[in-house]
């Protein structure tokens, strides 16, 4: 008799659990359908706004080209000044449109991420208790760590005069400032050469043999890229690129700071004279 009562209790408990899971499943499906149905409309609205901004941006670029062509052909100084101001306003407008496009794309990305996160939270209701507990612990650990922002930073607005010089590239008032493209290329080269020098200037990372010969002005072992002095009697012979301020091997002859004359392509006269005397003997 007792066994039958226990079985009935188990059956009723199982029925309650099944009913609860069915209710949760029904809620999940309903939320999922609402999310899936509304997401395309929200994305389409953002895409439409993005397309409108892009059309305005293309029109502004065309306006910039037209005004710049007129500026190059204009001889009157007053008219050139008016065209320059017109060009300046168009450049500012183009940058603002670009910033708005970036903001719309960021909103679209956040919209998709929020919907995915919402569905993931709902799906945890159907996991086993042990799995649900592990997922909860994992989410707590993730929340305790510094959160990485997925938001793309807005581009900083530069000054109007720098924007103008960046696009016109030949206007009288901005001739002393190099074009942005050239500045960016120069900055990239400097960054690459600096990183390369930092890598070459750190021989500590290598396992150094105490009996290994040393070179260069720094009296360190051979590592990284090195260049040889063209003076046959040079006491040091080899030099690290970073120690002699080189980023690439120069063409022709090269002399180290101890052996060079007026420049790195010529040898010191006193050193050359001593060399000739030795040959005469």
Curated annotation (Swiss-Prot):
Annotated site residue numbers, Histone H3K4me3 binding: 215, 226, 230, 238
MF terms in GO: DNA binding; histone deacetylase regulator activity; histone H3K4me3 reader activity; histone reader activity; phosphatidylinositol binding; protein-containing complex binding; zinc ion binding
One Pfam family it belongs to: ING
Region (Disordered): 123-204, 261-281
Keyword line: Chromatin regulator, Coiled coil, Growth regulation, Isopeptide bond, Metal-binding, Nucleus, Transcription, Transcription regulation, Ubl conjugation, Zinc, Zinc-finger
GO terms (BP aspect): flagellated sperm motility; male germ-line stem cell asymmetric division; male meiosis I; negative regulation of apoptotic signaling pathway; negative regulation of cell migration; negative regulation of gene expression, epigenetic; negative regulation of stem cell population maintenance; negative regulation of transcription by RNA polymerase II
Binding site for Zn(2+) 2: 229, 234, 256, 259
Positions of region (PBR): 265-281
Processing after translation: Sumoylation enhances its association with SIN3A and is required for binding to some target gene promoters, this is the case for TMEM71.
Chief location of this protein within or outside the cell: nucleus
Subcellular localization(s) per the UniProt record: Nucleus
UniProt binding sites for Zn(2+) 1: 216, 218, 240, 243
Cross-link (Glycyl lysine isopeptide (Lys-Gly) (interchain with G-Cter in SUMO1)) at residue(s): 196
The organism's place on the tree of life at top rank: Eukaryota
Composition skew (Basic and acidic residues), residue ranges: 131-141, 261-275
Zn-finger region bounds: PHD-type: 213-262
Annotated InterPro entries: ING2_PHD, ING_fam, ING_N_histone-binding, Zinc_finger_PHD-type_CS, Znf_FYVE_PHD, Znf_PHD, Znf_PHD-finger, Znf_RING/FYVE/PHD
Coiled coil start-end: 49-101
Biased composition, class Basic residues, residue ranges: 182-194
Gene Ontology CC annotation, any one: nucleus
Family statement drawn from the similarity comment of this UniProt entry: Belongs to the ING family.
PANTHER family: INHIBITOR OF GROWTH PROTEIN, INHIBITOR OF GROWTH PROTEIN 2
Summary of subunit composition and partner proteins: Interacts with H3K4me3 and to a lesser extent with H3K4me2. Component of a mSin3A-like complex at least consisting of SIN3A, HDAC1, HDAC2, RBBP4/RbAp48, RBBP7/RbAp46, SAP30 and ING2.
Task performed by this protein: Seems to be involved in p53/TP53 activation and p53/TP53-dependent apoptotic pathways, probably by enhancing acetylation of p53/TP53. Component of a mSin3A-like corepressor complex, which is probably involved in deacetylation of nucleosomal histones. ING2 activity seems to be modulated by binding to phosphoinositides (PtdInsPs).
Name this protein carries in UniProt: Inhibitor of growth protein 2
Lineage: Eukaryota, Metazoa, Chordata, Craniata, Vertebrata
């Amino acid at each position: 008799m007792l066994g039958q009562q226990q079985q009935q209790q188990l059956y009723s408990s199982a029925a309650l659990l099944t009913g609860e899971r069915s209710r949760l499943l029904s809620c999940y499906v309903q939320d999922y359908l609402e999310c899936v149905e509304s997401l395309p409309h929200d994305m389409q609205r953002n895409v439409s706004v993005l397309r409108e901004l892009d059309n305005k941006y293309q029109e502004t670029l065309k306006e910039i080209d037209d005004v710049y062509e007129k500026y190059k052909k204009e001889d009157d100084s007053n008219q050139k000044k008016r065209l320059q101001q017109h060009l300046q306003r168009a450049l500012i407008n183009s940058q603002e449109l670009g910033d708005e496009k970036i903001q719309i794309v960021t909103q679209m990305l956040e919209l998709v991420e929020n919907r995915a996160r919402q569905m993931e939270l709902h799906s945890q209701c159907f996991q086993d208790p042990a799995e649900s507990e592990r997922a909860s612990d994992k989410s707590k650990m993730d929340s305790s760590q510094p959160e990485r922002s997925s938001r793309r930073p807005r581009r900083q607005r530069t000054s109007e005069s720098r924007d103008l010089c960046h696009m016109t590239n030949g206007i009288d008032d901005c001739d002393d400032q190099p074009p942005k493209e050239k500045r960016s290329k120069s900055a990239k080269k400097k960054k690459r050469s600096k990183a390369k020098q930092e890598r070459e200037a750190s021989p500590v990372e290598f396992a150094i043999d105490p009996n290994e010969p040393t070179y260069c002005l720094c009296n360190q072992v051979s590592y990284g890229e090195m260049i040889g002095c063209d003076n046959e009697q040079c006491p040091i012979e080899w030099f690290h690129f970073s120690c002699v301020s080189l980023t690439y091997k120069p063409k022709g002859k090269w002399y180290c700071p101890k052996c060079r004359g007026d420049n790195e392509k010529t040898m010191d006269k006193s050193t050359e004279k001593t060399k000739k005397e030795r040959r005469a003997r």
